[in-house]
């Protein structure tokens, strides 16, 4: 699709205010998704747009939204209790980012009457309610959970359902992510409060069955728009995707070397890990080994700190952000030169979203995924599944591997000493490794990413663990890949640097020394049985086994006899004598269980030969 200039829109043309703000961003031409979606939305069509991440979807809905709200304001000014537009986003980071872009439009003097409010989890809901009661904003930018909560609130002198009766425009941003995060019910509930006479824009990086269902429920006769910068790829055109094969025990050293290299120091780097626990650990362990760069960590379980971390990442040159998939969608931070993935993500589509944090808005960018030797088939899998070509990172592999092997002992010593100096770091390391192993078992492409192919001892070495954790996956581990600390360490004497945690640990230690039981630890009580009960249980088990054996012998003998008499192909018929014998066997077994006959008498009656040792 050919690109058009923003000023070329003429059916209808953009207002001077909106056009001036867009041009102040430095954008002269529209991206393909903007070229396709904006005229349709301005023509009051419902639109479902699929476009690769980083393709300019935010302006594709903000621009027509502002134009539609202005038109209505000229006809009938917006009232003090009217909400004209809703923008629903899957995460608070993305919602906040949209709000920041929108704020730049609303600073224009001709758009000041279109005020907005950001409503996301993590903020005080009482403050949100107070603001909505005091001055209803024309535009709400929100996450679905908080918005649903406000719709359902009663008794707070707030009637949000009444305030959206004049709604003109609804945006469902990153719709596939909304559904992936389990917001399907919330979104459907929200749709039930909204008027049907509205325009809806649904934007998504992928079209799934769930998204199709949402389109049917929330859009009226929508126009479907599918825009890709290249028909043969699923990622931004100026993104270079690389991979590197590394041995499991060398993975952290390889990451450390990469983050220290001149190629990555010039810009920001995002490093994706599989779990929150992994981010927690490496955010503690990496900074001492990478002192020249600012290292930040963010994950989904962080509630109130996430906004501050993202803001610090934006404002810090050459920063390194360790994160989970909570930031795989929508985050638009300038100067991200590299996106690095510790290992393949749980789904192939997540790979596309992760690498889309760089090479945004037509800029260049790079992405690198570390693969183990057993994971090399992932390169072909990604090409078939997501149309993503991975190129091997051009390095002197033999020299790199040799250099990393030489650095491994020193790096491990630093990790070991970090954990030995603070039990908090030790705990985080253990949790990170266990969570990583568990996450690995849940890969979408488990046919090629198999847990049984991994040397878990070598993986534990990469984490610098002081010992291997107790977990089912390591129960029968026989490998010698794990490298223990070079110095002696008494794990029972590790202390927390956090004074409060250390105080709790010391109290538990005192209780343990007095009682022999660690406080809070689940006790597994063994059932106590008398000697007679134990003997009887063993006797019952043995008797049942012998009875099954005797019946099996009789059956074989009967089959052999039937075969000799030429009746083997007929269904076996039981005579009255056979039935009587079976009933006698059952009576004998019952008498044995009640101790009315001895085991020896039972064996003789059953014709079972004893074992002579």
Curated annotation (Swiss-Prot):
Protein origin, superkingdom: Eukaryota
GO cellular component: nucleolus
Binding, ATP: 51-58
Gene3D superfamilies in the cross-refs: P-loop containing nucleotide triphosphate hydrolases
Region Disordered: start-end pairs: 505-578
EC class: hydrolase
Keyword presence, ATP-binding: yes
Keywords noted in UniProt: ATP-binding, Coiled coil, Helicase, Hydrolase, Nucleotide-binding, RNA-binding
Name of the protein: Probable ATP-dependent RNA helicase DDX55 homolog
Organism from which the protein derives: Drosophila melanogaster
């Amino acid at each position: 699709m050919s690109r058009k200039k923003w000023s070329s829109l003429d059916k209808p043309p953009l207002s001077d205010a909106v056009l001036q703000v867009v041009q102040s961003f430095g954008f002269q031409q529209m991206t393909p998704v903007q070229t396709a979606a904006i005229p349709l939305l301005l023509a009051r069509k419902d639109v479902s747009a699929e476009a690769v991440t980083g393709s300019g979807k935010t302006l594709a809905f903000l621009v027509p939204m502002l134009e539609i709200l202005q038109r209505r304001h000229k006809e009938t000014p917006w009232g003090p209790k009217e909400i004209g537009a809703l923008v629903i986003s899957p995460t608070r980071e993305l919602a906040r980012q949209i709000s920041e872009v929108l704020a730049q439009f609303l600073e224009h003097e001709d758009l000041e009457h279109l005020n907005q409010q950001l409503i996301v989890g993590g903020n005080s809901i009482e403050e949100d309610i107070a603001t909505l009661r005091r001055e209803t904003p024309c535009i709400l930018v929100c996450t679905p959970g908080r918005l649903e909560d406000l719709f359902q609130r009663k008794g707070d002198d707030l009637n949000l359902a009444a305030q959206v009766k004049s709604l003109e425009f609804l945006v469902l941003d990153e719709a596939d992510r909304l559904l992936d995060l389990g917001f399907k019910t919330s979104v459907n509930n929200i749709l039930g409060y909204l008027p049907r006479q509205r325009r809806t824009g649904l934007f998504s990086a992928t079209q799934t069955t769930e998204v199709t269902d949402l389109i049917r429920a929330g859009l009226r006769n929508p126009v479907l728009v599918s825009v890709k910068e290249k028909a043969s790829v699923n990622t931004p055109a100026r993104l270079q995707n690389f991979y590197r094969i590394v041995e499991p025990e060398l993975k952290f050293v390889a990451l450390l070397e990469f983050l220290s290299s001149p190629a990555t120091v010039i810009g920001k780097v995002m490093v994706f890990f599989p779990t929150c626990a992994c981010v927690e650990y490496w955010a503690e362990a990496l900074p001492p080994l990478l002192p020249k760069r600012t290292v930040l960590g963010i994950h989904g379980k962080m509630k109130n700190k996430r906004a501050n971390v993202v803001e610090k990442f934006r404002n810090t040159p050459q920063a390194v952000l360790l994160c989970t998939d909570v930031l795989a969608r929508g985050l638009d931070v300038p100067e991200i030169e590299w996106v690095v993935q510790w290992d393949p993500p749980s789904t192939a589509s997540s790979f596309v979203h992760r690498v889309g944090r760089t090479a945004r808005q037509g800029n260049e960018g790079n992405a690198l995924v570390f693969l183990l030797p057993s994971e090399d088939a992932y390169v072909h899998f990604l090409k078939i599944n997501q149309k993503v070509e991975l190129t091997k990172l051009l390095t002197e592999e033999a020299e790199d591997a040799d250099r990393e092997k030489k650095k491994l002992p020193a790096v491990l010593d630093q990790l070991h000493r970090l954990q030995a100096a603070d039990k908090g770091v030790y705990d985080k390391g253990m949790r990170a490794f266990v969570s990583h192993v568990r996450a690995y078992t849940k890969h979408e492409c488990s046919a090629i990413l198999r847990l049984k192919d991994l040397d878990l001892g070598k993986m534990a070495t990469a984490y610098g663990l002081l010992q291997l954790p107790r977990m089912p996956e390591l129960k029968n581990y026989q490998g010698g890949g794990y490298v223990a600390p070079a110095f002696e360490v008494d794990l029972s004497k590790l202390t927390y640097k956090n004074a409060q945690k250390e105080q709790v640990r010391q109290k538990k230690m005192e209780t343990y020394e007095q009682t022999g039981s660690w406080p809070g630890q689940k006790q597994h009580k063994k059932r106590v049985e008398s000697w007679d009960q134990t003997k009887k249980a063993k006797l019952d088990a043995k008797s049942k086994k012998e009875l099954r054996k005797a019946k099996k012998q009789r059956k074989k003998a009967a089959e052999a006899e039937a075969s000799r008499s030429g009746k083997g192909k007929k269904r076996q018929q039981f005579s009255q004598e056979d039935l009587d014998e079976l009933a006698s066997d059952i009576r004998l077994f019952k008498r044995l269980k009640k101790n009315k006959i001895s085991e020896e008498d039972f064996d003789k009656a059953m014709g079972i030969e004893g074992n002579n040792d």
